[in-house]
């Protein structure tokens, strides 16, 4: 069996070799295996220094104070901690939360849990390009709104929300603003010293770091209070208890440091590859690019091939590892809720493929993907009676199908 070409970088990234080498130094008896909370001896001091350095590295990439970085097990936990933490701490101020229908499941399901606890959540529709209309957000704000949670970059369609304007609007109305930045760190410049953002979630494995590691930015000035969701030894200033995984933290810090040094050059290369991929598909019939192409990260191309089932196409192009939806929900055969929120019908949503490219993608891999996808789409359409009807000029949306 040949190993498929990896083009699913939004699902996860391989750990960078430089990151892995740093992590290994904090695992074995010959390295620095200490507990950073052991402040009475050398091993603990060394681990604590490593954790402090990593905290600084993460803060440097996003232009924040290292004291504002709270370690977590990943962006899912960070989103839970941010949203539940604010809701529970400030529930006497209000019980209304606003979010977007295209958010990651870890935001949407957290909001649904809060609804079961008596909170009210407004789920906003995006525009057809995936972006949020600020007027819609403004109209949804109320006296009892305590939190707005909007992701920076969408995991399926790669669009970049205007978090600067959203944050300003939130702060004008004394509302806390949380941003899920799992898909934007290392791809989009972030300066939290200039943005009106109160909480921001990060994931290491989306940026060539280890899985099971994340962070939450919690603004200190003006101070944001959150109620802990995990209790124990009072680690992370009482916000997230649990022994710190030094090797994981070091890995995340190194991944963020590499991103800070190489992001601009890497984005240029990845954008060129993404554009090459787009050019390879755009002249095909009945091809639709999902999401805004201007306000978008360089490595994402979500594209629908009409009259082809996405699942069938993925099986046909199994020499390329791609996705037809979020990694957390792609086991379902339901059409993507993100694409449905953009207004796509079931057929077009089902025919979508998400190509995401990254640090190790090559021009040869792009060309291979273009040739393979074009050939398989043509073959699958040749087998489709719907394609024949379309080619004969039949408006399939107006066909009344009889049940058998």
UniProtKB/Swiss-Prot annotation:
EC number(s) given by UniProt: 2.8.1.7
Reported cofactor(s): pyridoxal 5'-phosphate
Pfam families assigned to the protein according to its UniProt record, in alphabetical order: Aminotran_5
GO biological process per UniProt: [2Fe-2S] cluster assembly
Binding site for [2Fe-2S] cluster: 328
GO molecular function: 2 iron, 2 sulfur cluster binding; cysteine desulfurase activity; metal ion binding; pyridoxal phosphate binding
Catalytic residues as annotated in Swiss-Prot or TrEMBL: 328 (cysteine persulfide intermediate)
Keyword Iron-sulfur: yes
Top EC category: transferase
Residue list for modification N6-(pyridoxal phosphate)lysine: 206
Catalytic activity: (sulfur carrier)-H + L-cysteine = (sulfur carrier)-SH + L-alanine
Positions annotated to bind pyridoxal 5'-phosphate: 75-76, 155, 183, 203-205, 243
Leader peptide range in chain numbering: none
Keywords on record: 2Fe-2S, Cytoplasm, Iron, Iron-sulfur, Metal-binding, Pyridoxal phosphate, Transferase
Pathway membership, UniProt: Cofactor biosynthesis; iron-sulfur cluster biosynthesis
PROSITE patterns, alphabetized: AA_TRANSFER_CLASS_5
Quaternary data: Homodimer. Forms a heterotetramer with IscU, interacts with other sulfur acceptors.
Family label: Belongs to the class-V pyridoxal-phosphate-dependent aminotransferase family. NifS/IscS subfamily.
Entry function: Master enzyme that delivers sulfur to a number of partners involved in Fe-S cluster assembly, tRNA modification or cofactor biosynthesis. Catalyzes the removal of elemental sulfur atoms from cysteine to produce alanine. Functions as a sulfur delivery protein for Fe-S cluster synthesis onto IscU, an Fe-S scaffold assembly protein, as well as other S acceptor proteins.
Name this polypeptide is given: Cysteine desulfurase IscS
Organism: Vesicomyosocius okutanii subsp. Calyptogena okutanii (strain HA)
Encoding gene per record: iscS
């Amino acid at each position: 069996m040949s190993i498929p070409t990896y083009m699913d970088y939004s699902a996860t990234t391989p750990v960078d070799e430089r990151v892995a080498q740093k992590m290994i130094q904090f695992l074995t008896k010959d390295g620095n295996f200490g507990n950073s909370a052991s402040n009475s001896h050398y091993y603990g001091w060394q681990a604590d220094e490593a954790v402090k350095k990593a905290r600084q590295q993460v803060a440097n990439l996003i232009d924040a104070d290292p004291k504002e970085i709270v370690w977590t097990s990943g962006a899912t936990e960070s989103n839970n901690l941010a949203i539940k933490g604010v809701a529970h701490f400030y529930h006497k101020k209000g019980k209304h939360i606003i979010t977007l229908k295209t958010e990651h499941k870890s935001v949407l399901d957290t909001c649904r849990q809060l609804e079961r606890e008596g909170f009210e959540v407004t789920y906003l529709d995006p525009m057809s390009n995936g972006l949020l209309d600020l007027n819609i957000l403004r109209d949804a704000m109320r006296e009892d709104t305590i939190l707005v949670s909007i992701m920076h970059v969408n995991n399926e369609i790669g669009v970049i929300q205007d978090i600067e304007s959203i944050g300003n609007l939130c702060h004008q109305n004394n509302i806390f603003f949380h941003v899920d930045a799992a898909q934007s760190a290392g791809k989009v410049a972030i300066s939290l010293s200039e943005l009106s953002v109160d909480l921001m979630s990060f994931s290491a494995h989306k940026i060539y770091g280890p899985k099971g590691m994340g962070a939450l930015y919690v603004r200190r000035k003006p101070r944001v209070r959150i109620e802990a969701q995990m209790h124990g030894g009072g680690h992370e200033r009482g916000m997230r208890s649990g022994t710190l995984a030094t090797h994981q933290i070091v890995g995340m810090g190194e991944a963020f440091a590499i991103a800070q040094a190489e992001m601009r050059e890497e984005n240029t290369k990845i954008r060129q590859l993404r554009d090459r991929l787009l050019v390879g598909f755009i002249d095909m019939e009945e091809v639709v690019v999902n999401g805004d192409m201007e306000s978008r990260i360089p490595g994402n191309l979500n594209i629908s091939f009409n009259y082809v089932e996405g699942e069938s196409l993925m099986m046909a192009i199994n020499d390329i590892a791609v996705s037809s939806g979020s990694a957390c929900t792609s086991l379902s055969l339901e059409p993507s809720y993100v694409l449905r929120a953009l207004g796509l019908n079931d057929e077009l949503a089902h025919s979508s493929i998400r190509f995401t490219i990254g640090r190790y993608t090559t021009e040869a891999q792009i060309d291979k993907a273009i040739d393979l996808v074009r050939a398989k789409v043509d073959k699958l359409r040749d087998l489709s009676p719907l394609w024949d009807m379309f080619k004969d000029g039949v408006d399939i949306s107006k066909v009344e199908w009889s049940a058998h």
